[in-house]
Amino acid sequence: MQDFAAIDFETANFERSSVCSVGIVIVRGGEIVDSFYSLIQPEPNYYQWRCTQVHGLTRADTDEAPVFSEVWKQIEPLIEGLPLVAHNTPFDKGCLRACLMTYQMDYLDYEFFDTLKAARRILPHLPNHQLQTV
């Protein structure tokens, strides 16, 4: 796959709609051509300790951040027509669906590819398949 958008969401709590940051890398012709990162004010706007332990973000980091609908207006043109790649696709796809539903925005049927699933198949000898290990 030569053209794709790698996408990663982080959440403030265990609600998929509570996205507090998004990172995207655009790849065309096998080369990184663009990237995007934004903090997002989550909905609902509270942080669970376990989530903060994963990504290090707190409410203080996102209190002044834009809401998802504002950030999505910047993201949508970047990823238009590209398949999306994520590590543990059910999580990231679920976050995207939940946020779009929360803000009453249309969900296009984005094509997702899962690097976690691929890593488990291709690298079965690894002790785990977390992103930092792979």
Regions found by a protein language model. Name each.
Residues 96, 118-119:
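A generic structural signal for short hydrophobic patches within well-formed alpha-helices
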Residues 1-110, 124-134:
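Conserved non-catalytic scaffold segment of RNase H-like nuclease domains
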